[in-house]
């Protein structure tokens, strides 16, 4: 529950708080932060990915529902970037998780920030920092069966089972 409370319900509560202000102004812009894990499931992160998939779904729906009110949405889905959270994750990753996540390089925070700002300035709805992350998201959307086979193969090479 805690992960959903923070990632999904925290996002929803912030949106609920700002909508009356944007209605009064006649326009607004909301930038929701999900994750590459909200677009592509990641081994070992069921709760996290589920909560971030929920943010993606919420943002997709509200983008359409609130467009008539001139409220724009941006959905940011970064992969891992230099942060205390990633440092902590590295202390307890399973081998299965490590093999899957090493596909996408950990980005410097300033690169992520620059790409997010540029995406907002260019009025992009979906902002995925990093070329490799964008490629993986696109390929998993266009060729989901192939993506699943590749991930299953990678995990199968190192799978150790439940601990």
Question: Where are the language model's segments positioned?
Answer:
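SDR active-site lid
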Residues: 68-131, 149
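Residue(s) in the substrate-gating loop at a strand-loop-helix junction
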Residues: 35
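A short helix-coil junction within the Rossmann-fold of NAD(P)-dependent oxidoreductases
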Residues: 17-26
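Active-site loop immediately N-terminal to the catalytic Tyr-X3-Lys motif
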Residues: 40-46
């Amino acid at each position: 529950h805690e992960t959903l409370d923070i990632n999904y319900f925290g996002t929803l509560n912030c949106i609920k708080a700002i909508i009356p202000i944007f209605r009064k102004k006649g326009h607004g812009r909301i930038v929701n932060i999900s994750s590459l894990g909200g677009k592509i499931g990641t081994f070992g992160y069921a709760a996290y990915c589920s909560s971030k998939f929920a943010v993606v779904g919420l943002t997709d729906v509200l983008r359409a529902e609130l467009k008539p009110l001139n409220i724009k949405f941006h959905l940011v889905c970064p992969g891992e970037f230099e942060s205390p959270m990633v440092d902590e994750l590295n202390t307890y990753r399973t081998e299965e998780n490590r093999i899957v996540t090493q596909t996408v390089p950990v980005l410097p925070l300033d690169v992520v920030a620059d790409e997010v700002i540029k995406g907002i300035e260019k009025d992009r709805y979906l902002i995925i920092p990093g070329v490799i992350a964008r490629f993986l998201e696109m390929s998993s959307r266009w060729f989901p069966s192939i993506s699943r086979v590749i991930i299953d193969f990678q995990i199968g090479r190192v799978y150790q089972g439940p601990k």
